[in-house]
Regions:
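"Short basic amphipathic alpha-helical interaction patches in structured regions
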Residues: 143-148, 158-160, 323-325, 341-342, ...
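The feature captures the catalytic groove of carbohydrate-active enzymes
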Residues: 125, 194-218, 226, 334-357, ...
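An acidic intrinsically disordered interaction segment
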Residues: 88-99, 183-197, 258-279, 317-328, ...
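Short loop/turn segments at secondary-structure transitions that flank enzyme active sites
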Residues: 148-150, 235-237, 280, 342, ...
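Terminal accessory carbohydrate-recognition/targeting modules of carbohydrate-active enzymes
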Residues: 1-262, 294, 301, 312, ...
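Substrate-binding groove/exosite segments of carbohydrate-active enzymes
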Residues: 196-212, 217-221, 228, 256-363, ...
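Non-catalytic carbohydrate-binding regions of carbohydrate-active enzymes
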Residues: 2-12, 337, 341, 393, ...
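Extended, well-ordered alpha-helical scaffold segments
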Residues: 242-257, 262, 266-273, 315-328, ...
Length: 470
């Protein structure tokens, strides 16, 4: 998949699409295809303190400019509160390829700048490679200025926060960020830029203004011909080259697609995309699935639905088992977590359907993998879900006399239509939602097949069927 000059005719068009790289821990690298920040949660380097939902915003972006002996070309794309400061680097974009190792090609006055970005799997590390090609006799310098943030994902940097640049390190907010580059590092007078404007946040009613800090730049020079340079940031000392990091990621993606076994190019792309949402969960030492980037963490409903495509169809069976064990570990009174909030907060359980999707996920895993031992391991959890729903659990979730499941009361949001504005639920859906009872019937049919008490569940399933049809 490639995008060309015709896809970046103006700033609005340059912000329409984004790319996403993830590290399997909840961290990510995500900007617009033109390389800008259209949301405050966009970041060149969003790391993780505790996987997957204690995230840390290290670097917002890299400001890039190409300087010749006569001209300066600003390659960055970004909006500001004062629109006269807007950067229009998309005008120099010739090509963007966002797949696998994303690549950008800029061209100005016959000088070509190629940029590639990689995020290392299960590490807080991001690597950038530049290839600069200039005509014979032409001297040019690519200046790259990191836009520093160094704060928790949903917090602004402190006013008093310092940014200490050392040899191969940057220290701020009690953290040390390591960097490795073959360019020339030039310290700058610290500058706080507090008027970045995020157009898509503004449309959503979110806080649309943000700040970053500049205190150094890296210079990459070329004098005719082609030069290759690299820049790596990590929360640990850098031991590998960008070339090695990229080769390792390509090999990982190749093994992933070989395991899935698909030949169709679209299916192969989907396998790679699905993998971006699989993450480690430190609290259990297992796996989970992110509901979406850049906003969401791992949600129960989303995970149980997504595991069918992100794990089972792609034949990531060990990870599927780990995901199901993770949510079984957190099950309370028959309820799977609705979501794990950003940070250290306890999980929330206001969902009626996540547990029923869990039953379906275990069943589908068993059919696809043939791993009946794991299904037997999970069977007590499946029966616990159904039994709690029968006798009643939290959030007014209970089986009514007709066998159907009723859920929710007051301000409780228990289905996927969970919008709440102050004390108003525009779509409360309290009572007996149709999809919930379809899932309930499905869960009973599954237990009728798997449980030693199958006849009991079969009888109840028939009652539910009749009540549903009536």
């Amino acid at each position: 998949m490639r995008f060309g000059r015709g896809d970046f005719k103006n700033l609005e068009q340059a912000e329409e699409r984004c790319f996403l790289l993830t590290n399997g821990l909840g961290g990510y690298c995500s900007l617009t295809l033109a390389g800008g920040n259209a949301r405050k949660d966009h970041a060149l380097f969003m790391g993780v303190e505790k996987a997957p939902n204690c995230r840390y915003h290290y670097l917002t972006n890299l400001q890039e400019s190409l300087e010749t002996e006569k001209e300066v070309f600003d390659l960055s794309t970004q909006r500001y509160v004062n629109w006269t400061k807007n950067q229009h680097g998309y005008r120099y974009l010739q090509m963007v390829s966002p797949e696998d190792i994303p690549e950008w090609v800029f061209e100005a006055r016959g000088i070509t700048v190629r940029r590639e970005i990689v995020m290392v799997h299960e590490e807080n590390t991001v690597g950038i490679r530049y290839r600069i090609t200039a005509p014979e006799g032409t001297k040019a310098v690519l200046k790259v200025c990191p836009l520093l943030r160094c704060s928790k994902k949903d917090e602004e940097p402190k006013e008093s926060q310092s940014y200490l640049l050392g040899e191969k390190t940057l220290e701020s907010d009690g953290k040390r960020l390591y960097y490795e580059t073959d360019g020339t590092v030039v310290p700058l007078k610290e500058e706080r830029i507090s008027d970045l404007y995020f157009a898509y946040d503004s449309r959503d009613g979110r806080e649309a203004v943000g700040m970053v800090v500049k205190n150094h730049e890296i210079r990459f020079a070329v004098s005719g011909g082609t030069r290759e340079y690299s820049l790596i940031y990590s929360d640990r000392p850098v031991e590998k080259t960008v070339r090695e990091l990229m080769e390792a990621e390509r090999l990982r993606l190749l093994k992933l697609t070989e395991t899935a076994g698909f030949q169709d190019p679209a299916a192969v792309r989907l396998v790679k995309s699905a993998d971006q949402f699989l993450v480690k969960r430190e609290s259990t030492g297992g796996d989970s699935i992110m509901a979406g980037y850049p906003f969401f963490s791992d949600w129960g409903r989303d995970t149980m639905i997504a595991v069918l495509g992100c794990g089972i169809e792609t034949r990531q069976f060990e990870r599927v088992k780990s995901i199901l064990r993770t949510f079984a570990f957190y099950c309370e009174k028959g309820l799977m977590p609705n979501l794990f909030p950003e940070g250290e907060s306890e999980p929330l359980y206001n969902t009626v359907d996540a547990s029923l999707w869990f039953v379906e996920a275990v069943y589908e895993y068993g059919k696809a993998s043939g791993d009946l031992d794991f299904v037997k391991e999970m069977l007590p959890n499946l029966e616990s879900v159904v039994n709690w729903y029968r006798k009643g659990t939290d959030f007014h979730i209970f089986m009514d006399e007709d066998g159907l499941i009723s859920a929710g009361a007051g301000l409780e949001q228990v289905t996927w239509m969970d919008v709440r504005y102050e004390d108003i639920l525009p779509t409360s859906r309290h009572g007996k939602p149709v999809e919930v009872n379809a899932l309930w019937y499905n869960a009973l049919c599954i237990l009728a097949e798997l449980s030693e008490n199958g006849h009991e569940y079969e009888t109840l399933a028939e009652t539910v069927k009749q009540s549903f049809l009536e």
